[in-house]
Amino acid sequence: LEEGKGAVVPVVADALDTSNDGKLIHFSGEATTQDVVTDLDFAIEARALKLRRITKMYQWEEEKEERKEKVSGGGEKTVTRYKYSKVWSELHIDSGSFNRKGSRGRSNPASIPYESDEFVADKITVGTFQLSSSLIKKIDAFEALRLPAEVREEIGDRTVHRTGNGLYIG
């Protein structure tokens, strides 16, 4: 690390200097792209470095609660209680693993129809430097995208509803 610190060459991102080829360089600037990234499932596109879709499904969740109770004769027994509630979750909850006795009528779909996903511009640059895929993976500053006035009204056989700056399918 110390060796690298002494060998680093500060450069201006807007100027390419071939005398720095093969050297450890340092620059800063704004990452930009001319690409349009698209979420094909929802027909949403934006000129952005990345477009992140966050999806959640309303589904049953099981909560297991155990407590010890004294029994006549001086022993103890474990009493298990199961509670069920509906929650919004980005991850699929497998209701097949629920306690069968207490979960009657509480089953979740086999999968989330549209999972969370991330769409990335093909070419991202800072000045004259194109960022590597390993650097692009580290970009994690997101802001809400203002949805276009027109959004799909149906996806498959389901109606799409606008909810604030999001979509609800149901």
Indicate where each model-derived feature is located:
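Alpha-helical transmembrane signal-anchor/signal-peptide segments
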Residues: 1-17
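Soluble non-transmembrane domains of integral membrane proteins
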Residues: 28-170
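Short, solvent-exposed beta-strand/turn "edge" segments of beta-rich domains on protein surfaces
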Residues: 14-25, 43-46
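N-terminal start-of-chain detector that recognizes signal peptides
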Residues: 2, 26-28
